[in-house]
Amino acid sequence: MHQKTVAEISAALHAGEISSRELTDSLLKRIEQFDPRLNSLITVTAEQARAAADAADARLRAGEAGPLTGVPLVHKDIFCTDGVATTCGSRMLEPFRAPYDATVVRRLAEAGAVMLGKANMDEFAMGSSNETSYFGPVRNPWDLDAVPGGSSGGSAAAVAARLAPAATGTDTGGSIRQPAALSGICGLKPTYGRVSRYGMVAFASSLDQAGPFARTAEDLALLLGGMAGLDERDSTSVDHVVPDYSESLNRSIRGLRIGVPKEFFGEGLDADVRSRVEAALQVLEGEGAELVEVQLPNMELALPAYYVIAPAEASSNLARFDGVRFGHRCADPQDLEDLYKRSRAEGFGDEVQRRILVGTYALSAGYYDAYYRKAQQVRRLVADDFRQALDQVDVLAGPTSPTPAFDLGERADDPVQMYLSDIYTLGVNLAGLPGLSVPAGFSRGRPVGLQLIGGYFDEARLLNVGHKYQQVTDWHKQVPEGFE
């Protein structure tokens, strides 16, 4: 049953072919057996999961179940979970237990989903490889010497290894789509405001968005339906109708115009990745879609703009972790200043400290206009490029990441090379658009992802295109060796 998709598991649960408790126990055994090789989970909530599974089975017997009732999943450890550790992959929050559930956690629990545990992640979601976690790096199920992508690498690795059929993640500059691509699964970054950020520990508030991981676009449709919608506790949540995302999955894509940005196929794109993505585009063309070359002339400016805006917002958001109210507190501080300095120096890792320093500098007097304000102006140019391109076509398509998964430690000492991992994804966050990554083959045994980008609140169309692609390909059915 661990090889089944969310949709298949849901059907089996409703047909009485298996109980949620049986499925949950089976997956908990898989986690115990396989996760020591991956380190994909920080916390396993076995007792809580079994209780939730029993409650789901009662709902199923009573005929009160929905499509996610009884379906196990893991949550990225950036979402607050009542009474369960929420660490953000950091020593700073190692002792933190939230007194409430994040809206994403609450909504999925109300839908009957069963939380198996909390997934490992780059510290405070800052990273592209899941190597910055205080709890150790996550390994890629396809190659244990490779990274799974980041920052939601634990979520992606758990789904790829069949430890859970689904997971939640967050995407600030590619942190759902990039690990989905590198781990050979599907990941959706919804439109900014589509899913509540309440209870999601903030990295960069104008960029962060929660979304789901699964092995198929069909599964993502079910998960997004359970997560999306207005939340009055999140001022950035948008009151926009939530459609039945499953309803439009099987629509024909004949005549659909797919824009192919030439900037996504330039210098820096791995030749194997280019070949796999071009083959995927030909598959969509074979299904009746029309490929149209488009331009995003300011895309080369997206990376430097992002790495001003995101650290600036992070430096503000992470100022709250000071050793006074919650989180790590240094021993025997001499005075308040010593408490601040040592608690933050001990609690934050190198990459987080680097970004706090960059962000503080960008916001400082005398540099605000030269850096932060200028970056926001570039952000508008990038968003305008996407708008103009999407005025000509229905969706955009290209590679999710410029390379397949790289080796653990390969880029640890080269921040710029690490940041370039997100060069095709972070513009979508600057613009606030939805983006989807689906498996598109392999390069030297490591997965490659196809990225689809849509207009605001057009997740249904992206899922439709992704589903039609997966109906005529089988990359999503491949299983990492040793995790069968």
From Swiss-Prot:
Keyword line: ATP-binding, Ligase, Nucleotide-binding, Protein biosynthesis
InterPro entries linked: Amidase, Amidase_CS, Amidase_dom, AS_sf, GatA
EC annotation from Swiss-Prot or TrEMBL: 6.3.5.7
GO BP terms, alphabetized: translation
Pfam family, one: Amidase
UniProt keyword annotation of NADP present: no
Record's catalysed reaction(s): L-glutamyl-tRNA(Gln) + L-glutamine + ATP + H2O = L-glutaminyl-tRNA(Gln) + L-glutamate + ADP + phosphate + H(+)
Disulfide bonds: none
Keyword Cell membrane: no
Cellular-component GO terms for this entry: glutamyl-tRNA(Gln) amidotransferase complex
Enzyme class at the top of the EC tree: ligase
Active-site residues from the entry: K76, S151, S175
Molecular function GO terms recorded: ATP binding; glutaminyl-tRNA synthase (glutamine-hydrolyzing) activity
Matching NCBIfam families: gatA
Subunit-level organization: Heterotrimer of A, B and C subunits.
Family: Belongs to the amidase family. GatA subfamily.
PANTHER family in the record: GLUTAMYL-TRNA(GLN) AMIDOTRANSFERASE SUBUNIT A, TRANSAMIDASE
Function recorded in the entry: Allows the formation of correctly charged Gln-tRNA(Gln) through the transamidation of misacylated Glu-tRNA(Gln) in organisms which lack glutaminyl-tRNA synthetase. The reaction takes place in the presence of glutamine and ATP through an activated gamma-phospho-Glu-tRNA(Gln).
Protein name listed in UniProt: Glutamyl-tRNA(Gln) amidotransferase subunit A
Provenance organism: Halorhodospira halophila (strain DSM 244 / SL1) (Ectothiorhodospira halophila (strain DSM 244 / SL1))
Gene: gatA
